[in-house]
From Swiss-Prot:
EC number, UniProt record: 5.4.99.12
Family recorded in the similarity comment: Belongs to the tRNA pseudouridine synthase TruA family.
Taxonomic classification: Bacteria, Pseudomonadati, Pseudomonadota, Gammaproteobacteria, Enterobacterales
Protein name: tRNA pseudouridine synthase A
Source superkingdom: Bacteria
Annotated gene: truA
Complex formation: Homodimer.
Length: 270
């Protein structure tokens, strides 16, 4: 077939949300459920051709997202409704497309991103929850959110996060630029809101695990700064559970004009 008859390739970005509790993480793997596999299957049905997607951040097993961003290339010409309503009709109920946007060839969901933002939701009550039990992390001891917030501020800026990095992390460097970290109580819920240019493996959950030790009084506020300086993962607290973690937003240069829907999760304001 001559080049003039070849179908043009278009690049499309999607905003995705999912409840990760029934998935073995984002990344497609053999013989286990993954969000990527379900999304690619649904997109391929709508496009009537194989679709491969690239995401902004690969979430672990049990982790959720309200603001995941993906891109893919296709020769299929479809209306926006096909990439939203049509794809959603082919997805399981715990995965959904939130928006669609045509993007230029130079856009990449991962490499064009300038920052990622996560929220970690703790249900701080003596008794465990039933409703939303897979969407929050239960912690039974009383936590002082203001104390946790003060302790966390030492993490802001460019730092070596070795003390909060999983042993199996494959990143070339432990250095990350943490832009903000806020800890706030909403009734029985505590939300840790954290934004950085990127994250080392388990960074958010390891930070939260140590903050909870401070919040319940087991460690002083100064402990976070000591851990950061020590650059030793074995000194920090255990990794917090996956259930309470949400990827809520990914930042991109303004030139791409990507939608910015409410981050959530649920009723949490931006």
């Amino acid at each position: 077939m001559s080049e003039s008859l070849e179908k043009p390739v278009v690049k499309i970005a999607l905003g995705i949300e999912y409840d990760g509790s029934k998935y073995y993480g984002w990344q497609r793997q053999q013989e286990v459920r993954s969000v990527q596999e379900k999304l690619e299957k649904a997109l391929s049905q709508v496009a009537n051709e194989p679709i491969n997607v690239f995401c902004a951040g690969r979430t672990d097993a049990g982790v959720h997202a309200t603001g995941q961003v993906v891109h893919f290339e296709t020769t299929a010409i479809r209306k926006d409704a096909a990439w939203t309503l049509g794809v959603n009709a082919n997805l399981p109920g715990d995965i959904a497309v939130r928006w669609v946007k045509d993007v230029p060839a130079e856009f990449h969901a991962r490499f064009s991103a300038t920052a990622r933002r996560y929220r970690y939701v703790i249900y701080n009550h003596r008794l465990r929850p039933a409703v939303l039990s897979q969407g929050v992390t239960h912690y039974h001891l009383p936590l002082d959110a203001e104390r946790m917030h003060r302790a966390a501020q030492c993490l802001i800026g460019e730092n070596d996060f070795t003390s909060f990095r999983a042993v199996q992390c494959q990143s070339r460097t432990p250095w990350r630029n943490l832009m903000h970290i806020n800890v706030e109580r909403f009734g029985a819920y505590i939300v840790v809101d954290i934004k950085a240019n990127a994250f080392v493996h388990h960074m958010v959950r390891n930070i939260v695990g140590s903050l909870m030790e401070i919040g319940c009084g087991n460690q002083p506020e100064s402990w976070m700064a000591e851990l950061l300086a020590a650059k030793d993962r074995t000194l920090a607290a255990a990794t917090a559970k996956a259930e309470g973690l949400y990827l809520v937003s990914v930042d991109y240069p303004a030139q791409f004009e990507l939608p910015k829907p409410p981050m959530g999760p649920l009723f949490l304001a931006d």
